[in-house]
Amino acid sequence: MPHVKATAGQPTNKMPVPEHVVIPMSMHIGAPAEPVVKKGDTVMVGTVIGKAGGFVSANIYSSVSGTVQDIAPLRMVNGAMTTAVAIKTDGAQTVDPACVPPVVTDKASLLAAVQACGLVGVGGAGFPTHVKLAANTIDTLLINAAECEPYLTTDCREMLECSDTIISGITAVMKYCEIPHCIIGIERNKPECIDLLTSLTREMKGVEVKGLPMRYPQGAEKTLVETCTGREVPQVGPSGKPGLPADVGCVIMNVTSVSTLGKFLKTGIPLVTKRVTVEGDAIARPQNIEVPIGTLYRDVIDACGGVKEGVELGKIIFGGPMMGGAAPSADFPVLKQNNGLLLFSKKAAALPEPSACIRCGHCIEACPMGLEPVVIAQDFANKDFAALKARCVDLCVACGSCTYACPAKRPVSQTMGLAKGWYMAELRKGGK
């Protein structure tokens, strides 16, 4: 698979403050945050505008200084509804005086700091970080710096530009969570990052930088655990639910997530900005750009020169080409976990006509989880709950490898997603 990492060598640009931002209360797995501001309120960078709605949730902060214009329902790009806070910016980017470095002395205070930061997995999943760090059975911290998806280079730039906060974040997690080992996994197509972090961690006890095979999806958590430690995450964990890295003594943090923690411990400023790779053959100036969370993607596109002259825009993808999703427009906000915006011309975006499945098994060979997409598709067509359970459809990580491998050009990954969604819905209803 082509890597297409053209922006990896370009320093990150900072976007001018937009006139408006729209900040959703749901940018994470778990309960949405509850708005704690009202229309007309003045906010600053780092002002709490949404309080976590439970343990598996995360605080939401204003990414700009300005005035709350509205609090209203918002349909997200995936079709889900949430509440969002719309803010008119004043351009000053005044930081809230409440943003002070936290005092961390033990695991409890570190977890409180992580929660106060509003930190979630910024590599894509959006799982609240304080929840995963709360486990007491961890002996290995895995830093996911694989960044295996084509086009995306945000983690690469984080390593080259913010290595100091990566190190301070790792140090804090290892010290206060009493984790003796840390492995930083980086795909071998980023030799500068490997060399830099190897030199910075050489004297750090228990820390290893590991060059990973350039194989998609190397960054998938179960693949990462096996490649870095040799341990195999079980299909089913002790709780009866799908196995987790914690079941084999591992906790995974994205490299930008751990860097964000390092920055928060130093400055007290929570997660309010996001680096986004803007790429594709239809964008005028491909680049990595740092933007306030809640910035509309159309404003990001404008900051990158807009659509290339003479090119007819065919598709907008939020995220990478494998795991991202096509969007009907650019009128959606940047979220904590967004890391890519791809614009393709009509020619590049054109999809071949699918043909009949020839049962070649390429999708089975390509699946990193060892699933059988061709068989699962038939089980889903038959709405066979027992068969889908037996074939572990809930283990699908939506990596897109099956679609990429299919010679018939069938939308296999989409079918897998529908099958998993139907299965999980039936499971919640007590399906057997």
Question: Which stretches of residues belong to each language-model region?
Answer:
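Acidic low-complexity segments
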Residues: 70, 75-127, 132-136, 191
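Conserved hydrophobic positions within beta-strands
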Residues: 66-68
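N-terminal, Lys/Arg-enriched amphipathic/low-complexity engagement segments
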Residues: 1-36, 86
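Short histidine-centered loop motifs in beta-beta connectors
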Residues: 33-42, 46
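Histidine-anchored nucleotide/phosphate-binding helix
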Residues: 160-176
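Hydrophobic alpha-helical positions that pack around
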Residues: 179-297, 304-310
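Gly-rich Lys/Arg/Thr-decorated short loops/hinges at beta-loop-alpha junctions or inter-strand turns
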Residues: 121, 141-155, 282
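Ferredoxin-type iron-sulfur electron-transfer modules in oxidoreductases and energy-metabolism complexes
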Residues: 339-354, 364, 368-404, 408-432
